[in-house]
Amino acid sequence: MEYLNFMADVYGVGAQERKAHIEKYLALFELENAAGEQIKSYSRGMKQKLTIIGALVHQPPVWVLDEPMVGLDPRAAHILKEEMRKHCEKGNTVFFSTHVLEVAEKLCDEIAIIDKGHLVAQGTLEALRSGEKGASLEQLFLELTESEEKQA
């Protein structure tokens, strides 16, 4: 709880709002029973959930998440994906990085492919396919990054 209160302090979250958001996310990610324990006793997945809660406790309109599914169990990953969808449905934005291209394919309205620090392609999945009907994001990624390597 100290970590989450610290994160709320950093963002100036008031006492009532803080309590409500922390309770909501602890319940959502099934961490209520572990809230009083030291973080060093947490598993990798529990630490990841706690980090996510800390990032969301101030309800930012834009979420920037780096590999947010790493370490999460399937239930927690599903919950996070649903929260990301709900956030976007409210007119907000979620930027997230992932190496699991199927997740990006299912969740994203816009996709950016970055290879060795360079933006290789950006747009909707349909636009990126541009004539390659049925091409998966994985196939597109491999084609785009391979051609970049050959050009170098």
Q: Model regions: which residues?
A:
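ABC transporter nucleotide-binding domains
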Residues: 1-96, 101-115, 119-121
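Hydrophobic aliphatic residues
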Residues: 8, 84, 132, 144-145
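Short C-terminal domain-edge/linker segments immediately following a structured domain
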Residues: 94, 126-127, 143-144
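Conserved beta-strand-loop-alpha-helix hinge in the C-terminal portion
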Residues: 118-139
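ABC-family P-loop ATPase nucleotide-binding domain
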Residues: 148-152
